[in-house]
From Swiss-Prot:
Record EC number: 5.4.99.12
A Pfam family the protein falls into: PseudoU_synth_1
Stated role: Formation of pseudouridine at positions 38, 39 and 40 in the anticodon stem and loop of transfer RNAs.
GO function term, MF aspect, one: tRNA pseudouridine(38-40) synthase activity
Protein name: tRNA pseudouridine synthase A
Coiled-coil residue spans: none
Length: 245
Protein backbone atom coordinates (compact mmCIF):
# COMPACT_ATOMS: atom_id res chain seq x y z
CA UNK A 1 0.00 0.00 0.00
CA UNK A 2 1.45 3.35 -1.07
CA UNK A 3 0.61 6.93 -0.14
CA UNK A 4 -0.17 9.25 -3.04
CA UNK A 5 -0.19 13.04 -3.18
CA UNK A 6 -2.55 14.60 -5.71
CA UNK A 7 -2.72 18.18 -6.88
CA UNK A 8 -6.28 18.90 -7.92
CA UNK A 9 -8.35 21.72 -9.38
CA UNK A 10 -12.09 22.19 -9.22
CA UNK A 11 -14.99 24.53 -9.85
CA UNK A 12 -16.88 24.63 -6.57
CA UNK A 13 -20.04 26.23 -7.97
CA UNK A 14 -22.21 23.10 -7.72
CA UNK A 15 -20.73 21.68 -4.51
CA UNK A 16 -21.38 22.13 -0.80
CA UNK A 17 -17.70 22.64 -0.11
CA UNK A 18 -14.81 20.20 -0.05
CA UNK A 19 -15.66 18.15 3.05
CA UNK A 20 -18.15 15.29 2.88
CA UNK A 21 -21.71 16.13 3.94
CA UNK A 22 -24.60 13.66 4.12
CA UNK A 23 -26.70 13.55 0.95
CA UNK A 24 -25.00 16.61 -0.54
CA UNK A 25 -22.49 16.83 -3.42
CA UNK A 26 -18.97 17.63 -2.21
CA UNK A 27 -15.51 17.54 -3.77
CA UNK A 28 -14.27 14.94 -1.29
CA UNK A 29 -17.33 12.78 -1.87
CA UNK A 30 -16.91 12.78 -5.65
CA UNK A 31 -13.20 11.90 -5.52
CA UNK A 32 -13.64 9.14 -2.93
CA UNK A 33 -16.47 7.64 -4.97
CA UNK A 34 -14.21 7.44 -8.04
CA UNK A 35 -11.25 6.03 -6.08
CA UNK A 36 -13.50 3.34 -4.60
CA UNK A 37 -14.68 2.41 -8.08
CA UNK A 38 -11.10 2.04 -9.33
CA UNK A 39 -9.63 0.24 -6.31
CA UNK A 40 -12.73 -1.78 -5.33
CA UNK A 41 -12.25 -0.66 -1.73
CA UNK A 42 -13.16 2.38 0.38
CA UNK A 43 -10.51 5.11 0.30
CA UNK A 44 -10.48 8.21 2.51
CA UNK A 45 -8.71 11.31 1.27
CA UNK A 46 -7.12 14.08 3.33
CA UNK A 47 -6.75 17.66 2.12
CA UNK A 48 -4.60 20.73 2.77
CA UNK A 49 -7.75 22.75 3.38
CA UNK A 50 -11.53 22.44 3.38
CA UNK A 51 -12.88 25.03 0.99
CA UNK A 52 -16.42 26.30 1.62
CA UNK A 53 -19.53 25.90 -0.49
CA UNK A 54 -19.00 27.58 -3.86
CA UNK A 55 -15.24 28.15 -3.44
CA UNK A 56 -12.89 26.97 -6.20
CA UNK A 57 -9.33 25.61 -6.28
CA UNK A 58 -6.48 25.73 -8.75
CA UNK A 59 -3.99 23.92 -6.54
CA UNK A 60 -5.64 21.99 -3.73
CA UNK A 61 -3.49 19.16 -2.32
CA UNK A 62 -4.90 15.83 -1.17
CA UNK A 63 -3.42 12.49 -0.16
CA UNK A 64 -4.69 8.93 -0.03
CA UNK A 65 -3.48 5.33 0.14
CA UNK A 66 -3.80 3.06 -2.87
CA UNK A 67 -3.49 -0.74 -2.75
CA UNK A 68 -3.62 -1.63 -6.42
CA UNK A 69 -0.45 -1.89 -8.50
CA UNK A 70 -0.81 0.78 -11.18
CA UNK A 71 1.39 3.41 -12.79
CA UNK A 72 0.55 6.91 -11.56
CA UNK A 73 0.16 8.11 -15.12
CA UNK A 74 -2.52 5.48 -15.71
CA UNK A 75 -4.13 6.15 -12.34
CA UNK A 76 -4.44 9.85 -13.16
CA UNK A 77 -6.06 9.03 -16.51
CA UNK A 78 -8.45 6.57 -14.85
CA UNK A 79 -9.51 9.03 -12.14
CA UNK A 80 -10.05 11.91 -14.57
CA UNK A 81 -12.05 9.69 -16.92
CA UNK A 82 -14.54 8.96 -14.12
CA UNK A 83 -14.64 12.36 -12.42
CA UNK A 84 -17.13 15.02 -13.43
CA UNK A 85 -15.73 17.73 -15.70
CA UNK A 86 -15.59 20.31 -12.90
CA UNK A 87 -12.99 18.32 -10.91
CA UNK A 88 -9.57 17.44 -12.38
CA UNK A 89 -6.43 15.72 -11.15
CA UNK A 90 -3.43 17.79 -12.26
CA UNK A 91 -0.63 15.55 -11.01
CA UNK A 92 0.10 12.54 -8.80
CA UNK A 93 3.23 11.48 -6.96
CA UNK A 94 4.21 9.05 -4.23
CA UNK A 95 5.02 10.48 -0.80
CA UNK A 96 6.21 9.12 2.54
CA UNK A 97 3.66 7.76 5.00
CA UNK A 98 4.32 10.62 7.40
CA UNK A 99 3.20 13.28 4.89
CA UNK A 100 0.09 15.19 5.98
CA UNK A 101 -1.34 17.69 3.43
CA UNK A 102 -2.82 19.96 6.08
CA UNK A 103 -0.28 19.89 8.88
CA UNK A 104 2.84 19.87 6.68
CA UNK A 105 1.70 22.93 4.71
CA UNK A 106 3.80 26.04 5.41
CA UNK A 107 1.73 28.61 3.52
CA UNK A 108 -1.41 28.88 1.44
CA UNK A 109 -2.29 31.33 -1.31
CA UNK A 110 -5.80 32.51 -2.12
CA UNK A 111 -7.06 34.85 -4.85
CA UNK A 112 -10.31 36.80 -4.81
CA UNK A 113 -11.74 38.17 -8.08
CA UNK A 114 -13.64 41.46 -8.14
CA UNK A 115 -15.35 42.44 -11.39
CA UNK A 116 -15.14 46.25 -11.42
CA UNK A 117 -16.34 47.33 -14.84
CA UNK A 118 -19.99 47.86 -15.78
CA UNK A 119 -19.20 47.06 -19.43
CA UNK A 120 -18.80 43.33 -18.94
CA UNK A 121 -20.26 40.13 -20.33
CA UNK A 122 -22.81 38.56 -17.94
CA UNK A 123 -20.80 35.34 -17.64
CA UNK A 124 -17.72 37.23 -16.43
CA UNK A 125 -19.46 37.57 -13.09
CA UNK A 126 -20.08 33.85 -12.61
CA UNK A 127 -16.84 33.43 -10.64
CA UNK A 128 -16.27 37.03 -9.58
CA UNK A 129 -17.86 39.55 -7.21
CA UNK A 130 -19.34 42.40 -9.24
CA UNK A 131 -18.87 45.81 -7.60
CA UNK A 132 -20.47 48.61 -9.59
CA UNK A 133 -18.66 51.56 -7.99
CA UNK A 134 -15.17 52.25 -9.36
CA UNK A 135 -12.74 51.10 -6.66
CA UNK A 136 -9.55 52.95 -5.75
CA UNK A 137 -6.87 50.26 -5.86
CA UNK A 138 -4.37 52.46 -4.01
CA UNK A 139 -6.71 52.78 -1.02
CA UNK A 140 -7.39 49.05 -1.10
CA UNK A 141 -3.65 48.32 -1.06
CA UNK A 142 -3.14 50.64 1.90
CA UNK A 143 -5.58 48.43 3.79
CA UNK A 144 -4.01 45.23 2.45
CA UNK A 145 -0.62 46.36 3.78
CA UNK A 146 -2.10 46.42 7.29
CA UNK A 147 -2.57 42.63 7.11
CA UNK A 148 1.14 41.83 6.82
CA UNK A 149 2.61 40.20 9.92
CA UNK A 150 1.10 38.23 12.81
CA UNK A 151 -2.37 39.33 13.90
CA UNK A 152 -5.30 38.09 15.93
CA UNK A 153 -8.02 37.64 13.30
CA UNK A 154 -10.93 37.16 15.71
CA UNK A 155 -12.76 40.02 13.97
CA UNK A 156 -12.68 38.08 10.70
CA UNK A 157 -13.47 34.68 12.18
CA UNK A 158 -16.85 32.99 12.28
CA UNK A 159 -18.73 31.87 15.38
CA UNK A 160 -18.78 28.31 13.98
CA UNK A 161 -14.98 28.32 13.63
CA UNK A 162 -13.72 26.19 16.52
CA UNK A 163 -10.02 26.92 15.86
CA UNK A 164 -8.31 27.52 19.19
CA UNK A 165 -5.85 30.16 18.00
CA UNK A 166 -7.00 33.11 15.94
CA UNK A 167 -3.37 34.21 15.48
CA UNK A 168 -2.31 33.94 11.84
CA UNK A 169 0.72 35.21 9.94
CA UNK A 170 0.18 36.96 6.63
CA UNK A 171 3.22 37.11 4.34
CA UNK A 172 1.70 38.85 1.33
CA UNK A 173 -1.51 40.76 0.58
CA UNK A 174 -2.04 42.82 -2.56
CA UNK A 175 -4.72 44.05 -4.97
CA UNK A 176 -3.83 43.91 -8.67
CA UNK A 177 -5.67 45.28 -11.69
CA UNK A 178 -6.18 42.90 -14.60
CA UNK A 179 -8.43 44.10 -17.43
CA UNK A 180 -11.96 44.36 -15.98
CA UNK A 181 -10.96 42.68 -12.74
CA UNK A 182 -9.28 43.64 -9.50
CA UNK A 183 -7.66 40.55 -7.98
CA UNK A 184 -6.83 40.32 -4.29
CA UNK A 185 -3.96 37.90 -3.61
CA UNK A 186 -3.09 36.81 -0.09
CA UNK A 187 -0.53 34.34 1.28
CA UNK A 188 -0.67 33.22 4.89
CA UNK A 189 0.33 30.44 7.26
CA UNK A 190 -3.30 29.31 7.38
CA UNK A 191 -6.74 30.88 7.37
CA UNK A 192 -9.84 30.82 9.53
CA UNK A 193 -13.23 29.83 8.17
CA UNK A 194 -14.54 32.63 5.88
CA UNK A 195 -11.57 34.82 6.90
CA UNK A 196 -10.51 35.89 3.40
CA UNK A 197 -14.07 36.66 2.33
CA UNK A 198 -14.70 38.66 5.51
CA UNK A 199 -11.52 40.69 4.98
CA UNK A 200 -12.43 41.45 1.36
CA UNK A 201 -15.99 42.36 2.30
CA UNK A 202 -14.87 44.88 4.92
CA UNK A 203 -12.20 46.47 2.72
CA UNK A 204 -14.61 46.92 -0.18
CA UNK A 205 -17.27 48.35 2.14
CA UNK A 206 -14.80 50.90 3.54
CA UNK A 207 -13.75 51.88 0.01
CA UNK A 208 -17.32 52.18 -1.31
CA UNK A 209 -18.31 54.40 1.64
CA UNK A 210 -15.08 56.40 1.25
CA UNK A 211 -14.22 55.93 4.93
CA UNK A 212 -10.64 56.56 6.12
CA UNK A 213 -8.38 53.57 5.39
CA UNK A 214 -7.41 53.50 9.08
CA UNK A 215 -10.94 52.26 9.75
CA UNK A 216 -9.77 48.86 8.56
CA UNK A 217 -6.95 48.74 11.11
CA UNK A 218 -9.34 49.68 13.91
CA UNK A 219 -11.70 46.89 12.87
CA UNK A 220 -8.82 44.37 12.65
CA UNK A 221 -7.51 45.33 16.10
CA UNK A 222 -10.96 45.39 17.73
CA UNK A 223 -11.29 41.57 17.82
CA UNK A 224 -15.03 42.19 17.56
CA UNK A 225 -16.94 39.95 15.12
CA UNK A 226 -19.85 42.41 15.06
CA UNK A 227 -17.70 44.89 13.12
CA UNK A 228 -17.15 42.45 10.24
CA UNK A 229 -19.99 44.01 8.21
CA UNK A 230 -20.41 42.23 4.88
CA UNK A 231 -18.84 38.90 3.88
CA UNK A 232 -17.90 38.81 0.19
CA UNK A 233 -19.53 35.97 -1.82
CA UNK A 234 -17.85 32.57 -2.07
CA UNK A 235 -18.08 32.29 -5.87
CA UNK A 236 -15.09 34.63 -6.41
CA UNK A 237 -12.59 32.87 -4.11
CA UNK A 238 -9.87 30.51 -5.34
CA UNK A 239 -7.37 28.38 -3.42
CA UNK A 240 -4.39 28.91 -5.72
CA UNK A 241 -1.47 27.11 -4.14
CA UNK A 242 -0.26 25.23 -1.07
CA UNK A 243 3.41 25.61 -0.16
CA UNK A 244 5.42 22.89 1.60
CA UNK A 245 8.83 24.59 1.61
Amino acid sequence: MKKVLAKITYDGSLYYGFQIQPKKPTIQGEIEKVLEKISKTKIKIHSAGRTDKGVHARGQIISFYIKINIKLKNLKTAINSLLKDDIRIIKLKYVEDKFQPRFDAKRRKYSYYILNNENHYPWEGYRAYYVKKKLNINRLNEMAEMLIGIHDFTTFSCIRDQTNSKLKEIYYARFKKKNKFIIFEIIGSSFLWKMVRSIVGVMIDIEIKNEPVDTFKKILNSKNRKLTRKTAPAKALFLDKVFYE
